[in-house]
Amino acid sequence: MNIAEYHQNIEQVWLQIEEQLEEQGCDVDCDTQGSVFTITFADRSQIVVNKQEPLLELWLASKAGGFHFAFKNNQWIAQDGKLFWQCLEQACLAHGEQVSFS
């Protein structure tokens, strides 16, 4: 994946996150600032999904933990085999919102 494809891929991920949260009626606010996408929950807690361009990785941080994902086999996968979308669902649940991204 080249840099342009990397950015396009992550921007699609961010768009899908925002669309699914809205469609499923989650009480959250989404904001993008440069390479950082933030989901803020009603209690002001946050999930941060950000680009790590030098590594071509996608990072996720929340009170459920921190994860680093690389794009392999057409999906974002952590080194331990966890999938991005599953980790994001678990993180949202830890912040009080049940949402499905599949």
UniProtKB/Swiss-Prot annotation:
GO terms for cellular component: cytosol. Pfam families: Frataxin_Cyay. Keywords: Iron, Metal-binding. SUPFAM superfamilies: Frataxin/Nqo15-like (SSF55387). One of its GO terms (molecular function) is ferrous iron binding. It comes from the Bacteria. GO terms for biological process: iron-sulfur cluster assembly. PANTHER family: FRATAXIN (PTHR16821), FRATAXIN, MITOCHONDRIAL (PTHR16821:SF2). HAMAP family: CyaY (MF_00142). Involved in iron-sulfur (Fe-S) cluster assembly. May act as a regulator of Fe-S biogenesis. Belongs to the frataxin family. This is Iron-sulfur cluster assembly protein CyaY.
